[in-house]
C-alpha cells in the first residue's frame, strides 16, 4: 500500500492516512477483504505515532470501510449499499460544502461540474 504523508501539510496526518486509504479503495488498489497493515507497522513505516494511525483506522471503521477484529486485524470492507445514516451524513456534508461555495460566489453549474469531475476520476 502506498500512502503519501506530508508532515508539513495543514491537513492532519491522521486525515492524510484516512484519505489515502479511501483513495486506494476507490481506485481499486485496495480490495474488499484485503487486510491493512497493523497500526504499529504503518506507524513505523511512515514515522508517525501509532495513535495517529489508530485515529485514521477508527475513522475508516466509523465510515464503514473497514472492520477490525482481534485475530484478523483491520480489513477492507466495502458495503454493498450505503446505509440510511451514511446517506444522511453525505447529505449534511454536501449541504455545508454547497452552501459555502454558493456564499463564495460559485454558480450551481460550477458546483455540479466540480462534483462530476471528482466522481468521474474514481468511477
Regions found by a protein language model. Give the residues of each.
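Extreme N-terminal segment that seeds HTH/winged-HTH DNA-binding domains in transcriptional regulators
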Residues: 1-35, 41, 81, 85-93, ...
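Solvent-exposed beta-strand sheet faces enriched in polar/charged residues
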Residues: 4-6, 69, 77
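Contiguous, function-dense segments enriched for cysteine-driven chemistry
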Residues: 12, 20, 44-47, 61, ...
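N-terminal helix-turn-helix
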Residues: 35-67
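Minor-groove-contacting beta-hairpin "wing" of winged helix-turn-helix DNA-binding domains
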Residues: 38, 72-78
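General helical structural elements
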Residues: 44-45, 58-59, 75, 91, ...
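N-terminal helix-turn-helix/winged-helix DNA-binding helices
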Residues: 69-73, 86
Amino acid at each position: 500500500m502506498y500512502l503519501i504523508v506530508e508532515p508539513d501539510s495543514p491537513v492532519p496526518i491522521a486525515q492524510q492516512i484516512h484519505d489515502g486509504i479511501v483513495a486506494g479503495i476507490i481506485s481499486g488498489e485496495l480490495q474488499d477483504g484485503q487486510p491493512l497493515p497493523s497500526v504499529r507497522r504503518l506507524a513505523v513505516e511512515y514515522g508517525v505515532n501509532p495513535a495517529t494511525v489508530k485515529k485514521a483506522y477508527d475513522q475508516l471503521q466509523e465510515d464503514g470501510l473497514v472492520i477490525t477484529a482481534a485475530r484478523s486485524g483491520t480489513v477492507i470492507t466495502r458495503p454493498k449499499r450505503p446505509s440510511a445514516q451514511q446517506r444522511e451524513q453525505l447529505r449534511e456534508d454536501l449541504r455545508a460544502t454547497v452552501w459555502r461555495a454558493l456564499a463564495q460566489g460559485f454558480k450551481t453549474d460550477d458546483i455540479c461540474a466540480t462534483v462530476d469531475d471528482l466522481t468521474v476520476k474514481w468511477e
